[in-house]
């Protein structure tokens, strides 16, 4: 979605995740690099609205919300790889997202400096 949608950025993955929520599908594009199995039922369709939508493929921490759904993209525990450098992706290693499940309030915890990130 990021590579094929104008205005999307690898540094703001939550924006792409919100597009997936709007489309109600985890793989809304056909063809390209994402293989889609020819099954009788499309298992990538979001039939129910999730409370939390979590991903983390590109190693950049990002938090947002969309129509009551908490959107969380996890970072990583490693620094920038050569591939990420060629793609212009700057990961955010060592930052974990913790969610209070009673309130759905997210918090970032920076393990690089052992402090909470605003």
PLM regions with names:
Residues 1-118:
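Extended recognition/assembly regions associated with phosphoester-bond processing machinery
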């Amino acid at each position: 979605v990021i590579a094929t949608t104008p205005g999307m950025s690898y540094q703001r993955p939550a924006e792409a995740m919100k597009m997936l929520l709007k489309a109600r599908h985890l793989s809304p594009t056909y063809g390209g690099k994402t293989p889609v199995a020819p099954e009788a039922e499309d298992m990538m369709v979001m039939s129910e609205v999730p409370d939390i939508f979590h991903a983390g493929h590109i190693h950049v921490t990002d938090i947002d919300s969309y129509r009551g759904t908490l959107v969380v993209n996890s970072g990583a525990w490693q620094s920038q790889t050569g591939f990420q450098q060629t793609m212009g992706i700057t990961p955010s290693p060592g930052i974990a997202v913790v969610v209070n499940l009673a309130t759905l309030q997210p918090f970032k915890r920076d393990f690089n400096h052992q402090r909470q990130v605003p």
